[in-house]
Amino acid sequence: MQFVASEHPHRRLNPLNGQWVLVCPHRTQRPWSGQQEKAQKNELPEFDPTNPLCPGVTRPNGIQTPEYESTYVFENDFPALVEVVPVPPNNDDPLFQIAPARGNCRVMCFHPKSNLTLPTMSAAEIVVVIDEWISQFNELSAKYAWVQIFENKGAAMGCSNPHPHCQIWSCSFLPTEPQLKQERLRAYYATNERPMLADYVERELQRQERIVIENRDWLVVVPFWATWPFETMLISRNNNKRINDLTAEQRYNLALTIKELTTKYDNLFQCSFPYSMGWHGAPTGPEHAHASSAHWTLHAIYYPPLLRSASVRKFMVGFELLAMAQRDLTPEQAAQRLREVDGKCHYLEK
């Protein structure tokens, strides 16, 4: 019997964190009778007087959101991290380690209208979002070791407010995922004298089978090691290390790429496609200001939960929680489906 990746179970290594993913393509034929999600409704009003992220509405803490006309950033009313916090006492017990955690949490509204999302915004409006990301990054990266820009879109990914927005959490420490990448990227660079993701981009361009979108500045792929069904990685092709390295032209092409990718997502199942996404780049702050970042390549990751339709999602439970990550649809099959979906015209505009 000859191995066929699209038919037989196998494991794939994620070189960014050293963890393996179990791929079981034969399971795509199994019947499904599990939980189905309610698709997010698209009939949202432009303005909701009860939504605290809308212009002019008073938030639960009594602060009125200003009448903003573009992006709007404010300090999170219920932050996970705060800047002033007592330092924990020293503890030498290896089983009860504790460390300080300082930081800042902000909310950033993409647009004053509640019924828009990134795929239904114009490229020019998305450029404004990117510019604000960079402005916030410039300010916060001077002080903090890690600035995590991320968006949770849709109730299926825990988003409690449908208004188009993201969050920016800044940490005095390097969080777990970036720390793993820092170590793996640095080790690869020490051995190969090349950034891992620069080599990865070259290899994917040669193979073509996992590419979703390709242009001069950006590459979108379903990673070889993807865990989520339609997971994608948006990678800089210009040796950018951090988001504030981007030129005006690269920002505009990024806006076009984000719009095309998220339009493909929405068109795949003709719904407002939920996901969690975020940016990863070289660490920042005084601790990392003078350290080499040659091993890093700026990239974003999209983790969408939907599997078979707008109402069927993947759950990370059982074996995934207790043993290792597992997927059914192969990354190559997912990439082909995303490639074939229209990314230029949103289904609501047809």
From Swiss-Prot:
Names of required cofactors: Zn(2+)
Cofactor note: Binds 1 zinc ion per subunit.
Annotated Gene3D superfamilies: HIT-like (3.30.428.10)
A single BP term in Gene Ontology: galactose metabolic process
Ligand binding (Zn(2+)): C54, H163
Sorted UniProt keywords: Carbohydrate metabolism, Galactose metabolism, Metal-binding, Nucleotidyltransferase, Transferase, Zinc
GO CC field: cytoplasm; cytosol
Broad class of enzyme this protein falls into: transferase
Family, per entry: Belongs to the galactose-1-phosphate uridylyltransferase type 1 family.
Organism: Drosophila melanogaster (Fruit fly)
Amino acids binding UDP-alpha-D-glucose: N76, D77, N152, Q167, K314, F315, M316, V317, F319, E320
Enzyme Commission number: 2.7.7.12
Active site: H165 (tele-ump-histidine intermediate)
Pfam families: GalP_UDP_tr_C, GalP_UDP_transf
CDD domains per record: GalT (cd00608)
Name assigned to this protein: Probable galactose-1-phosphate uridylyltransferase
Pathway note: Carbohydrate metabolism; galactose metabolism
Subunit structure: Homodimer.
Top-level taxon of the source organism: Eukaryota
Sample GO molecular function, one term: zinc ion binding
Catalysed reactions, semicolon-separated: alpha-D-galactose 1-phosphate + UDP-alpha-D-glucose = alpha-D-glucose 1-phosphate + UDP-alpha-D-galactose
Record gene name: Galt
Region (Disordered), start-end ranges: 31-52
